[in-house]
Amino acid sequence: MPSVRIKEREPFDVALRRFKRSCEKAGIVSELRRREYFEKPTWARKRKKTAAVKRAHKSNIIVKR
């Protein structure tokens, strides 16, 4: 869990912005969005397979140049 120490005389908005940024870097927001709805195991496998195919195509394109 990201934590932010509030500096002396620091406005709340600035501290909140730093906290949000640290949460983004930790991947909390994307993890929440991913877990928002139940994903069937078949859908998860299909999503992972298509991502692997995209990565393979992308790496082939970069290598061919």
From Swiss-Prot:
Name the source's superkingdom: Bacteria
Which is one GO molecular function term here? structural constituent of ribosome
One matching Pfam family, short form? Ribosomal_S21
InterPro entries associated with the record: Ribosomal_bS21, Ribosomal_bS21_CS, Ribosomal_bS21_sf
| Cellular-component GO terms for this entry | ribonucleoprotein complex; ribosome
Query: Which of UniProt's keywords are assigned here?
Result: Ribonucleoprotein, Ribosomal protein
* UniProt-listed GO biological process terms: translation
- What is stated as this protein's family in its record? Belongs to the bacterial ribosomal protein bS21 family.
**Which NCBIfam families does this chain map to?**
S21p
Tell me what this protein is called.
Small ribosomal subunit protein bS21B
Q: Which organism is it from?
A: Francisella tularensis subsp. holarctica (strain LVS)
Phylogenetic classification of the source organism: Bacteria, Pseudomonadati, Pseudomonadota, Gammaproteobacteria, Thiotrichales
What gene codes for this chain? rpsU2
